[in-house]
Amino acid sequence: MVTFSSYPFDPRPRRAIDALVGAGATIDLICLGDGKAPKREVRNGINVLRVPLKHPRRGKVEYAFRYGIFILTSGVVFALRSLLRRYDLVYVHNMPDILVLSALIPKALGAKVVLDLHDPMPELMRTIFHVSEDNRSVRLMKELEKWSIARADLVITVNLACRRIFSSRSCEVEKIAVVMNAPDGQIFPFRTPPANAPANRVDTERFVIMYHGSLVERNGLDVAIDALATVKECVPCAELRVFGPSTPFLEKMMETALNKGIQDSVRYLGPRKLEELVTEIGKCDLGVIPNHRNAFTDINTPTRLFEYLALGKPVIAPSTLGITDYFNRDSLLFFEAGNATDLARQIEFAYFHPREISEIARRGQDVYREHTWDRERQTLLERVSGVLN
């Protein structure tokens, strides 16, 4: 297996590894080194090789340079190891898509190749670099995507929206399996919403709205803060709690809260481990996913959505394709992506109608139960087994 990310911190490769090891696989893993973990180690029976490269943080040139070094390194390692023992399978995680190059020698010697496309690179590039679909780099990403998919025996992706995109421009739909990023049931135990929620909310000390995740512009913390400023006019006890690693964008948003006079109602509480997030979600009244609308968020199905629902909490999410493929207005509170006024309206509805949103959360849990990790893991193992057989 190869991934341009750190192990065991990137959850999707980690859980794929756990699933395959549980099914009896022996795994050699090539991944990024974070400067702290050893370059080589045997961890839980997995042979781990870490390449000492930092994840790129700047422009396209740095991305291309670091990707190139990593692809060359992993390709050479897999080629040399293939001389000593033949691989049955090479499992490649994007980004980049052309990391599949590292599997060329094992494939020539008979190995099957699985390409796990976490994100469509053209859409992500459009979002990160604010370029149009006709941009030359975006067109190149589409060509590389098609070329990379052609090298794979099986493509795995994260939701129906991504499957539609890949099948529309790169391969037949039958080649693509959907394995969603569902919460770990061992960490996020299933909890039902209150059975007898009141029809109306009595005055409370506070009404806690929660945001957790990456604090970048596309994820819409600014939308949540603008909405909170409106909500405070009729729900004075409303409070927004923010969790995630600090960023310059967060600092800018805290200044915005200060300028709006709601700084005491926007609490930044830092990053949390998954186990700690369970406790924090348990303390909130409502989760929000306040995304802006762009090429990437339009097709994204946030794992955070399922994390709230697993713990019985109502959640407001944008009415984008990656979400409406699975949920309708009976099972989720929707707002128009990027629209702070609409988000404020839905938060107010949630506050004043506790019984109704409890029922909506309950129906949302029915959707979540169709996509628990136990089910998604089984899909993964069945499709990989089908390729090998």
Where are the language model's segments positioned?
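N-terminal subdomain of nucleotide-sugar transferases
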Residues: 1-47, 231
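Nucleotide-sugar-dependent
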Residues: 10, 219, 275-280, 287-307, ...
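Membrane-proximal helix-turn-helix segments that form the acceptor-binding/catalytic region
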Residues: 79, 101, 105-109, 121, ...
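Conserved donor-binding/catalytic core segment of Leloir-type glycosyltransferases
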Residues: 156, 201-228, 241, 361
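Carbohydrate-associated surface elements
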Residues: 161, 182
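Nucleotide-activated donor-binding/catalytic signature segment of Leloir-type glycosyltransferases, i.e.
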Residues: 251-278
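Conserved acidic donor-binding segment of nucleotide-sugar-dependent glycosyltransferases
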Residues: 329-340, 349-355
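A short, well-ordered alpha-helix in the C-terminal region of glycosyltransferases
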Residues: 349, 356-370
